[in-house]
Regions:
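Residue-level detector of conserved, function-critical positions
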Residues: 1-147
Length: 147
């Protein structure tokens, strides 16, 4: 499957992980190893492997994205946030998620935005219409009745 599959070579161009995975949109960023882990696709589902090719998270998710030190997984219409360092996962509550940089994750719950840190602690509750990062601070717009 080397002609169409995805595998990994070391710096001497020696195969270290067999070409057994499927290509996917965004593989040249999400499929790269980060802190010893990479997102792979197998049988149409996404999982996470280590540098030896062992699954840390089996291929079980419809979609999987890296959010700096966290990962986002989608099952159905909602997202969960996974932490490999804490071996934990949030309930699938979020309509959308996105990395804001510096370890912060933006999430949308019940039509409103909130923010959490890399330790999965809520920094801002989901009560905002908009949260944007601008240089080294955040700009928020509340969801008050007069907006």
């Amino acid at each position: 499957m080397k002609e169409t599959g995805v595998g990994y070579l070391n710096s001497q161009a020696e195969e270290v992980i067999d070409f057994q995975y499927e290509p996917y949109m965004g593989i040249m960023s999400s499929g790269l190893f980060y802190e010893g882990y990479a997102i792979v696709k197998s049988d149409g589902l996404f999982g996470i492997i280590d540098t030896a090719g062992n699954y840390k998270i089996s291929a079980q998710y419809k979609q999987l994205i890296r959010l700096e030190d966290l990962y986002g997984s989608r099952q159905g219409d909602h997202w969960s946030i996974l932490s490999l360092t804490k071996d934990s996962i949030t309930p699938a509550l979020f309509a959308s998620i996105n990395a804001l940089g510096d370890g912060f994750v933006l999430y949308k719950e019940n039509g409103k935005y909130g923010m959490m840190d890399a330790e999965m602690n809520a920094i801002l509750p989901p009560v905002y219409r908009v949260i944007k990062k601008f240089r080294d601070y955040f700009v928020t717009l509340g969801c008050g009745n007069d907006l």
